[in-house]
Curated annotation (Swiss-Prot):
Gene3D superfamilies: P-loop containing nucleotide triphosphate hydrolases (3.40.50.300). It holds the Pfam family MMR_HSR1. The keyword Cell cycle applies. Necessary for normal cell division and for the maintenance of normal septation. The keyword Aminoacyl-tRNA synthetase does not apply. Belongs to the TRAFAC class TrmE-Era-EngA-EngB-Septin-like GTPase superfamily. EngB GTPase family. This is Probable GTP-binding protein EngB.
């Protein structure tokens, strides 16, 4: 998927009836607000603004679907851990995201994104724990690697690995500025997809 021929927004929603049919495999992206999720998706698909970036944490409160090369769906899930949003919005986030993750049969992998400069938060640990409980393949992408030195990156990678209980092959490094890690992340995603199954339309017999 390194060669991107098309990338387009499909739809947004908060409930299953808003989702696309589910006839394409889906890769979902999740993480705390402002970890660089939108920038990661834009670089992966070679687009500057397919996914809008925002300096306001918690701005994205919908599940957004993007079709790539007509053969794969990238799913942008709302960021968590945001402080400056109404309590009711925070209460809605959990059920909305859990409904998608637990019930989407075409979901092939979740990319959990963490900032290299931060210690993983409790929400990150709980999200990873939840995904593992549902046996959903996970790739942890460590973003903003251009913001720290190589020595600091190594220290933080070790800290993130210990905090989340990750093996080296469960992590990938990324920089939106230099595009470091783009090809490696696609390779990991494609390897995970190859181990999975062909999607069936949600609600239809297997």
């Amino acid at each position: 998927m390194v060669n991107i021929t098309s990338a387009e927004f499909v739809t947004s929603g908060t409930r299953p009836e808003h989702y696309p049919p589910g006839d394409l495999l889906e890769i979902a992206f999740v993480g705390r607000s402002n970890v660089g999720k939108s920038s990661l998706i834009n670089v992966l698909v070679n687009r500057k603004s397919l996914v809008r970036t925002s300096s306001t944490p918690g701005r994205t409160q919908l599940i957004n679907f993007f079709r790539v090369n007509g053969s794969l769906m990238l799913v942008d899930l709302p960021g968590y851990g945001f402080a400056r949003v109404p309590p009711e919005v925070k209460r809605q986030w959990g059920p909305m995201v859990e409904t998608y993750l637990a019930g989407r049969s075409c979901l092939a992998c979740v990319v959990l994104i963490v900032d290299v400069r931060r210690t993983p938060a409790e929400e990150d640990r709980l999200m990873l724990q939840w995904l593992r409980a549902y046996d959903i393949p996970v790739l942890v992408v460590i973003t903003k690697c251009d913001k720290v030195s190589k020595n600091e990156r190594a220290k933080q990678a070790s800290l993130i690995s210990r905090t989340l209980g990750l093996a080296p092959d469960e992590m990938a490094f990324f920089s939106a500025l230099s595009r470091e890690g783009r090809d490696a992340i696609w390779a990991r995603i494609e390897a995970i997809m190859a181990e999975g199954h062909s999607p069936s339309v949600d609600g239809a017999p297997e």
